[in-house]
């Protein structure tokens, strides 16, 4: 009772808690952000950018300031620039964040949203207030260097990786309950194998779909009890592990916001990613992408063996031979185009640009 009285379970939802970003010379954060964006616009588009481009940047700047996400952009561009300075391959942009011209100007992304008619509102919309989320890809082999940089910059007690829970799927629920009930493993395994192998199928769906399973439940009360109990625990957490990409960065020590634990000597939150977002904490995805590593290695080999230096920012996106290859389904090893479904789609689409 004494411990219970001392516990505090008051949570603050809907209030964003961004870590503090230190600007050069203590400059006003928004003024510094504007400076970076306007310098970046000149760098990207020249001294006299099209009027529509300048207007788009002003609109984004106003929206970002009003929604309180100036520091968010500054935090992201800081570690992205660090990675680039260290020669760590960084993806050009993925997801809705590629629709921000401000992100393009300051160097978070390298995809021109105006050229490809990308919408800023998919990323940040005043009518749908939610934390924006840049998905940043890094070289798989050097991703940890970027996380280490963020940890040094904000402090080890201000950075943690994020827990993720594996849940009990249909067959696992049957096997776990059968073991607790003391049923013979062979009998339990026979029941589990009657669950169709459809992806993410639930026990209720399995019962509807599998006539042999329904028959066994009707004939054997023990199997009926097994299934009834398994349905109650299906979907519950079974084991904890560390999220492959998620990192939380906080203004005050992480422990002042959420409980922590260690997993393989890594400090992780005991709250999952969606809960952290609801609490207003900054969650970043540091995605390790093997494709970037392969591309960098290929560029190095071309330089070494052929004496040709390739700049991946200046390659031709309208190479007819490449487009013809994609149109015939020859996309093995091409990121996001290598699945059977995408190959068939490319054959039907036959891209021309």
Could you describe each region identified by the protein language model?
Residues 1-353:
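Alpha-helical scaffold/interaction cores of sigma-54-like transcription cofactors
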């Amino acid at each position: 009772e004494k411990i219970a009285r001392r516990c505090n379970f008051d949570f603050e939802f809907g209030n964003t808690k961004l870590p503090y970003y230190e600007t050069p010379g203590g400059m006003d954060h928004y003024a510094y952000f504007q400076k970076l964006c306007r310098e970046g616009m000149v760098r990207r588009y020249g001294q006299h950018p099209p009027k529509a481009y300048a207007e788009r940047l002003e609109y984004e700047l106003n929206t970002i300031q009003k929604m309180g996400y100036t520091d968010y952009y500054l935090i992201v561009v800081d570690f992205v620039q660090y990675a680039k300075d260290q020669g760590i391959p960084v993806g050009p942009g993925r997801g809705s964040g590629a629709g921000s011209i401000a992100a393009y100007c300051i160097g978070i992304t390298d995809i021109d949203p105006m050229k490809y008619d990308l919408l800023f509102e998919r990323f940040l919309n005043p009518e749908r207030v939610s934390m924006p989320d840049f998905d940043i890809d890094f070289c798989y082999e050097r991703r940890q260097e970027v996380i280490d940089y963020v940890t040094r910059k904000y402090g080890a007690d201000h950075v943690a990786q994020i827990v993720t829970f594996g849940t009990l799927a249909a067959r696992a629920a049957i096997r776990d309950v059968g073991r607790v009930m003391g049923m013979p493993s062979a009998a339990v395994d026979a029941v589990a194998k009657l669950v169709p192998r459809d992806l993410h199928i639930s026990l209720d769906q399995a019962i509807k779909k599998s006539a042999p399973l329904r028959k066994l439940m009707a004939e054997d009360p023990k199997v009926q009890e097994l299934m009834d109990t398994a349905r109650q625990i299906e979907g519950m957490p079974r084991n904890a592990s560390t999220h492959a990409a998620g990192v939380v960065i906080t203004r005050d020590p992480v422990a002042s916001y959420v409980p922590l634990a260690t997993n393989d000597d890594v400090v992780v939150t005991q709250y999952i990613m969606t809960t952290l977002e609801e609490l207003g904490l900054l969650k970043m995805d540091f995605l390790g992408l093997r494709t970037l590593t392969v591309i960098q290695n290929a560029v190095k080999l071309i330089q070494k063996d052929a004496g040709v230096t390739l700049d991946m920012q200046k390659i031709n996106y309208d190479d007819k031979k490449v487009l013809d290859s994609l149109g015939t389904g020859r996309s093995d090893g091409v990121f996001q185009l290598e699945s059977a479904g995408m190959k068939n789609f490319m054959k039907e689409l036959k891209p021309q640009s």
